[in-house]
Amino acid sequence: MSILIKNGYVVYGENLEVIKADVLIESNKIVEVAKNINKSADTVIDAKGKVVSPGFVNLHTHSPMGLFRGLADDLPLMDWLQDHIWPKEAKLTREYTKVGAYLGALEMIKSGTTTFLDMYFFMDAVAEVTLESGLRGYLSYGMIDLGDPEKTEKEVNEALRIMKFIEGLDSDRVHFVFGPHAPYTCSIALLKEVRRLANEHGKLITIHVSETMAEIGQISERYGKSPVVLLDDIGFFGRDVIIAHGVWLDSRDIQILARHGVTVAHNPASNMKLASGVMPLQRLLNAGVNVGLGTDGSASNNNLDMLDEMKLAALLHKVHNLDPTVADAETVFRMATVNGARALGLKAGIIKEGYLADIAIIDFNKPHLRPINNVISHLVYSANGNDVETTIVDGKVLMLDRELFTLDEEKILNDAERVIGELT
């Protein structure tokens, strides 16, 4: 299977050089980027007036939570979770979760996301949807034991069951990740066991860390230290760890994260909507910490649009620092692409020969994207997910000219309405 993308503005290489060129894909790899490629291909896409971008990597989300979009807004995190989200989640079944996963996959494909790091329940169902959709998914079961040894064993067993299920799919696109929810919902015993199992099985770990001041206070009262210091003291960190949020980090925390090569997944929309705080982006970057970008779940965003998320990230840190030079467009674009891919150990996030063919084509033939003075600026500050015309993952076209090839959009939307009616 080969694809030839012609006449586009290509965001090329590590330096994000924008060139007018063609892109040739064979199997699941980019094999050539050059002007006027004169070779036959199974599929030819005319990208005139369009931008050929690396697909976006959503480094933290809860994809089935689109079911809860708009059900509870304008609340602090713990009120939102305890009074609204957790009671609804207690009613979830595998079928309901699968419907939510379809809705999330549909939204991601239509907005140019090609890879996502997920944490939720019934992750075997999410894995089935990911496989069918054509997306690249890194899937974690959210482990919570609340200090109960019986729950610790149960959560570990469920995670291992999901791992075995995902490995049984034998897909290069669908991967298992260990996902202890957070230091305030997981015992030290569970966190240590996750670290041991990740070493044994060679898996990544993702965990919520230092999202709110309430969490900082709770962990400080319980252990006498910050969540980051706590995790460091038990030997939890490594280059295979991706922490979500990292809002409330002091200088010592940042030094620890940098020393261990931990990645932080920044979720600006969710952090602003829940008034959790502003993560110290510039200090993290200055320390050499890899920072990716995530949307969090749709219930606290309220979408999975990575183009939208880039703009919010850029604007948030400029106004917070009273400095228009921070979080510049190129920095934020890297966070949404290559930085996320790097965290996952994925040779993607860059359009270059030898890299995986995970690509989004964005239609710039629109008034809000003309004139084309600066492609990266337009992608960060002007574009949105509805401007994505074509999405390619692993060398397979999932959407072309806004037409979907792997999912039934009408059925997914109808099922979502039915399920939320039954849940509420």
UniProtKB/Swiss-Prot annotation:
One protein family per Pfam: Amidohydro_1
Positions contributing to substrate binding: 89, 181, 211, 296
Residues given in the record as Zn(2+) binding sites: 60, 62, 208, 296
GO MF entry, a single one: 5'-methylthioadenosine deaminase activity
Catalytic activity: S-adenosyl-L-homocysteine + H2O + H(+) = S-inosyl-L-homocysteine + NH4(+); S-methyl-5'-thioadenosine + H2O + H(+) = S-methyl-5'-thioinosine + NH4(+)
EC number in record: 3.5.4.28, 3.5.4.31
Keywords recorded for this protein, A-Z: Hydrolase, Metal-binding, Zinc
InterPro entries according to UniProt: Amidohydro-rel (IPR006680), Deaminase_MtaD/DadD (IPR023512), Metal-dep_hydrolase_composite (IPR011059), Metal_Hydrolase (IPR032466), MTA/SAH_deaminase (IPR050287)
Keyword Metal-binding applies: yes
UniProt similarity note: Belongs to the metallo-dependent hydrolases superfamily. MTA/SAH deaminase family.
Protein name: 5-methylthioadenosine/S-adenosylhomocysteine deaminase
